[in-house]
């Protein structure tokens, strides 16, 4: 029997379900990597990608992954699954996904074209996932050695709260005055 109480409970349930965000699942690509639907689609010209991100008032980051990497998968299914994390990243960053053993050709900031695998070696990327964060302008990077081009790096998996903190660290330019560890310690508990 339909009572007023059951009707109200049903209406409230529908409202809650309707308000719940539906998260788009990561897609398993042909190269065996999971990809978020909001990742940057790119011609793999890093200077152009960085400048395009800057024009959109965003920062540019490269996510390095490897097929079969359990922590890469966890980054997608745990870290990116949190709405506060994915919303913050989408609003403030352009994320380019690269494969540490990939064969696609990428044009580095210095104009040199390399395979993804060669680019990973050039930058000393050894762990997956690794996130490389770059400054706001591409032009000065051309003259710098590869490892001096990034403003921050997250080598390996970070738990969700630390992961979000790393993106905040870069967005807030805290790297100009303190280490990531100092930044995390300064955050409210």
Predicted segments, located by residue:
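Short active-site neighborhood of thiol/selenol oxidoreductases, capturing the structured segment around
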Residues: 56-69
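A short beta-strand-turn-helix
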Residues: 42-58
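Structural micro-motif
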Residues: 116-132
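Typically the conserved alpha-helix immediately C-terminal to a functionally engaged Cys/Sec
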Residues: 73-88
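Thiol-based oxidoreductase modules, predominantly thioredoxin-like and allied folds used
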Residues: 89-113
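N-proximal helix/coil linker or "cap" segments that precede and/or mark the start of modular domains
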Residues: 25-39
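N-terminal secretory signal peptides and thylakoid transit peptides that target proteins
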Residues: 1-14
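Non-catalytic, surface beta->alpha helical segment in thiol-disulfide oxidoreductase systems
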Residues: 135-175
